[in-house]
Amino acid sequence: MKKSQREDIFKKMSEEMDNITAEEIIDKHLQKDLDAEENQNVAKTLRGKVREKLKISKINKGEKSSTEQLIDSEIHQRSKLSPQTEVSLDESLSFFILSGEEGSALGKSSEQRPVNRSYPKCFSLGVNLQNVAESEEEEFMKEFILTDILKVKAADYEDDQEQIKKQKANIFVPSSSPVVNQRKLPKDMMPRILEDEGFYIQRKPEIYKKTCNKMENRLLKLEEGKCWFGESGEIMSLPTPIKQSWNFRLNVRKEPLNPLLKTIYRKAVKYDLGSSFMNKMEGSREIYQLDLNIVGLQFSHHHLFNQEQVLCARLLQLYECFQDRQQQNVSQLLYEKLKALTDATKLSNENSEINQLTRKSLQDYYWQISNTKQMYDLERGKDLSLLHSILRTWKQIKSLRHGQGFTSTPIKLQVQRIKMNKCDEQEQISEMSETEKKNEGKELKNGKKLESLSYLASDETEIERIKPITLRPQLSFTAELTSLSKCSLHEQKRRAKIQKLKYFIKIFYNNKQVSCTSVSPLQFDFKVMFQQIFNIQLMYWPEVICLEVYEKSKRTSLLAKLYIPLPNYTELKGKTALQYVEFSSDKLVMPADGEVGSNVPFLLEGNGTEELCLLTSGKLSYSLSWSLDENGLPLIPMPQSLRSSYCSMLRNVDARSVPGIPWLMNEQKLFEWANEVRIDPNNPEYSDLMESVTYMRLKGQDIPKYFRLEQLQDEFNFVSEEEMAKSKRFQLLQLRNAGQLDNFLLQQMPLHDTEIPDLVFQEYESQKEKEVSVSDVNSITAQRINSANFLKKVRRLIMKRIVKISKCNLSDIVNDYEEIVSTSQLTDAVCKFVEPRRKLKPQRKERKKVTAQAISDGDIKILVRIVRAYNIPTRKTTINGSLDMPTCLKSSISCLRHRETIKSVASDETLHEDTVHPFVEVSFQHTVYKTNTASGSHPCWNEEIKVDFVSPGHDYSFSSLSKIKDNIYINIFDEMMTEKHEDHCLKSCSGHSYIRKNWLGCIVFPFSALLQQSEISGTFQVTIPPVLLGYTWSNTYVFPKEDSNEQNLKECTFLNIFATIEPQISYVTCNPTLDKFLDQTEVLQRAQIFKKNCKAMFPNRRIVTTVFNDEGIQFLVTRYIKALNPPQQLLDIFLHNSNATFDLIARFVSLIPFVPNTPDENDGSDIWMTSEHCISLAIGNKEEHAILLCNFFLYFGKKALVLLGTSVLEGHVAYVVTQETNEYLLWNPSTGQCYKQFDPFCPLKSVDCLFDDRNVWFNIQQNNTPMAVFFDYSKESFWKQLLPKNVQGTKIQSIQPEEIIYFETDKSMVEDLRNRIERTLKSKVMEWRPKHPTHWNRQCTFILRQILPKLEFGIGSFVSSEGDNEFERILQFYWVTGFPIQMPYIDVQSIIDAVYQTGIHSAEFPQTEFALAVYIHPYPNNILSVWVYLASLVQHQ
């Protein structure tokens, strides 16, 4: 025991000392970088010191024992015999450690290595010697060795962060963040989603998203890591091996479930009029029985069918159809009818006198003969087609049998030819011809003009020789089957499989299994015979009877479920015929040994082009009937309906004393109900009811002795319920009372239905459809829709609040009312008729305004006059050998310029300028009007276009017209005529000429802008794309205006237009008084008074002082102005160019979608959101955009104000004015463009109002055009201010947040949206070209995709250096015309409309190819910039 304990102690101490003491000593020696000789010296020194200690201690204690001397001598001899051990550092240290391993105290504080090999040999001398040596050596260790050699020091500690850094240097931990597709795919390759292209992709295993991301990051660290990714950018993986199973999973939990917690499922049952027969029948018969006879199964297709049996099954089906048609014998019946009509016509023609009645009969006969002949031909054609199909199928079967060398089916087809009696046929035809001749002779004798009748007779009685079908197929099962030994190996295996298959059927009654058939084998003709009768005794009402067909081979599987109908009460045992119910199974069975399988496509050998995919199908033959007892009585339960029970219950109840039962209150209703139900009068259950019905019939029209209110209800109704339901005004009143109608909040309800347009109800229905949540669209599109719906709801609630406190004046109701304030105004009105007329100085008269009630469809037209254009780009081609190389035009609107590239091309090659043939198209409401084609870069048309206009709902009131959201497009095109010579045509032949139009630019303005103003007139800058392939600027330049010489406008196109509505429509502005709110403060009241005074001075100028927020609270407009931070992403793009940063911020604001036009912009209420809500919802009106842009400019310390005015092309607008060092700049938030104050082409027409965070200023200058306005609002003679100067210093608390928090746009959703837009545009282009094929040039599309990202910020060259050579290669073979268009993302439909307006799809030149690329640049908060590059390519001839 002591020896074993000692060995255990040595092992523990050695393990502990090995980890601490040895490591410390080794680390010290390693740090001093001692070589092997120094280590040996240290070992010798230590060993000598130990020996000296031993000698001294032994001298003091006395002489050693013989045992100790033996041990020392043994140790000394072994040390001499092994000099290599002394040289080793580890062995010298272990020698020292071995001399102190037996101390008990050392095991508590140190860890040692195992004992030396020589030490155990000392223990073999005896147990007694060991015990003596133990105590002495332990004391020696404590006193001498431990105190001199071991040193006590603090433990070394290493920081956790340093350990982590060391681990990171050796261990790679992949990130769980998602990886973009560009890193996983080859360069310039877009992900390809096969599912979106219509391919079937099997379901892949579900993997945790973070795990998948880690795996992708780990693979990308490898050199060949991209080979692990597929075309879609996902890791390639096999489909999931887990298949969904319908097997029930047992509860395998060990602990038993509390029985009180178990759910007991019970089937819902009807009210107990006796679900059980036993409880209901009392003493009557209680046993009812159904007899189910299951005959067998017949498979119309089986997975063990070979191709011959597939054809035989088809032949059987065709033969059954042929037999059915032969039984119907429709063709023969029509032939006999035709013969009878011919005989009747013959008899009528033989009559000597033809009266009016006879002529009508003859005409009717002729029509019937014609129709009957057509029907006969149709039915005869069906019979012939069916016969041909039978013969063709039989021919395939014979060919297949001959090819495979054996016969698998006993089917045999024989065709018999039936001889017809030709005499009867010739006789019938001769009779028809004689009838026709006699009819014509009589008409000539009578001399009557029966041209129409003779025409019909001659046309319809011309009956050709009828050739009846003389072939009759007969199908038999007499063909001899090939013996098994003579068949192929595959056929032998297939027949062996047939013998192994067995089937059985389970019978379920009311979802409970009641019986099961015996297992029957499958025969070679694929029939399974059961022939078993099952007697089902009923205790509950029969609800459903289900038969489950099972297939049994190596395993049992469910093949199909069959639900058979319950028999009626006349179907008794022995009197029912067999019935058939079809079944099918979608079970997938792969073919193996010559069979075709099931649910697997295959090709017929007889017809290699016919591909079939058949499912396992067949039919079950059975009969279900009610059984008979010993006496021959049917065992059928008598049904008892709910109404009969109520009648029996209320048999003796007085009708007048029970007012709660409606059918007993009104005898007439009870009488009508009894007639509709058709109650059996012989049923004793209804005896009392039939007595009442008989009594009512005999009573007739006797007046009852009691009063019935329902009988007099019609007299109380002033109009019928049908007319009330059709009344439009009544429907509107109901909707307004329910608070669901917003259109008539600020106007009275029309009195007559004719004044109410149907558009009101259409808008209400469409509004309800839009409010339904959208689930099948992109999340960004869904955000746009939800934001618009949210703003509509907010506006609706605030409008209801305004209506409650608004009051209308007389002028708001009476349109013709004109208030005369004083007598002087009356005198002026009279003097107008007396003052002289000066012909040389005519006075301008205002156009007469027409009221909406006097306008009908066709009275209103939009007049658009196209005067002339300036600086239209011209076509430019370069001559390089025999090839024409097109160049491209760069617009000055975009920052993308390539003048150096163009100059280099021009210097190297010879250039010549082609002429341009421009024309203008005006488009409104999908109707296009075109001007004549002019010539040159500065054409003059001077043409007036009258655009037809029809208001939706035929309502021409201003409120209805203001709902029209359509735009008026004025597009400039270049007409090109191209001739194409066909290859097969001679040189002298003239080629085909094709006209194509190339889009050059457009001017767009909404219809609402034209409605608000009397006219739109002037010279406007045309919006042209940044790049126009194939075009360049003209060398000649004409200044559009005299005051535009100083500006550099050589790279701009201008168009002079005039547009108006004829006649002008009058409208009434509704300005509700908003000063009746209970929570009005002194400042808000002052603002309302200030607004009234300003409107009195200049009624046509805009002034806004107070608005409502999205919570319906009224605020001063100055509280919306506050410096707010723009997105940091925009600030990091142009770090050293502040002007470019301001332009980018203005562009960012213009990309936020605008709120659709309000139902009536003259409702006098303004609802503005804060800038934070405008950014978060990604939608806003014009004023909210201007406020947001102003707040961004204030963030940079610029002096900015919001300007309210009127634009020529946009109507009411809101601009931002910034004061620079020497000038004022006008920023348009809707387009992001900046204009100088004295820019003649600035679309701003009037400056009406300014406001910032301190005050509101109203423009009281007589001329309010931007070029004439003096913007120093400190001058009170020019600007009228709302707040006095003593109040301006104290800033009012803003309702804007301290800062706006932005979030990044999901790039995966942006990519998904880009793919959707690109697919939709391609399908639309093909849809717009129904008569021409549409070919897409992939190489050009690839190049355009590389160009688009560089156009967003206008950086880089037109084509990249990598794609330059590829683009030049395309230009060598194609004439390329195209352009990019840019727009903010609102919805997909707006992008489709913009592409359609360019007309690039209208190219009719054959073999025209197209290229289309879409790029979406994401900004924060789902604000997107959409670029669409369109190009058409025509191959050089």
Swiss-Prot record:
<dbReference type="Pfam" id="PF17661">
    <property type="entry name" value="DUF5523"/>
</dbReference>
<dbReference type="GO" id="GO:1904491">
    <property type="term" value="P:protein localization to ciliary transition zone"/>
</dbReference>
<dbReference type="InterPro" id="IPR056288">
    <property type="entry name" value="CEP76_C"/>
</dbReference>
<dbReference type="Pfam" id="PF24656">
    <property type="entry name" value="CEPT76_peptidase"/>
</dbReference>
<dbReference type="InterPro" id="IPR056290">
    <property type="entry name" value="CEPT76/DRC7_peptidase-like_dom"/>
</dbReference>
<dbReference type="Pfam" id="PF15625">
    <property type="entry name" value="CC2D2AN-C2"/>
</dbReference>
<dbReference type="GO" id="GO:1905515">
    <property type="term" value="P:non-motile cilium assembly"/>
</dbReference>
<dbReference type="InterPro" id="IPR000008">
    <property type="entry name" value="C2_dom"/>
</dbReference>
<dbReference type="GO" id="GO:0035869">
    <property type="term" value="C:ciliary transition zone"/>
</dbReference>
<dbReference type="InterPro" id="IPR028928">
    <property type="entry name" value="CC2D2AN-C2"/>
</dbReference>
<dbReference type="InterPro" id="IPR041510">
    <property type="entry name" value="DUF5523"/>
</dbReference>
<dbReference type="InterPro" id="IPR035892">
    <property type="entry name" value="C2_domain_sf"/>
</dbReference>
<dbReference type="InterPro" id="IPR052434">
    <property type="entry name" value="Tectonic-like_complex_comp"/>
</dbReference>
<dbReference type="Pfam" id="PF24652">
    <property type="entry name" value="CEP76_C"/>
</dbReference>
<protein>
    <recommendedName>
        <fullName>Protein CC2D2B</fullName>
    </recommendedName>
</protein>
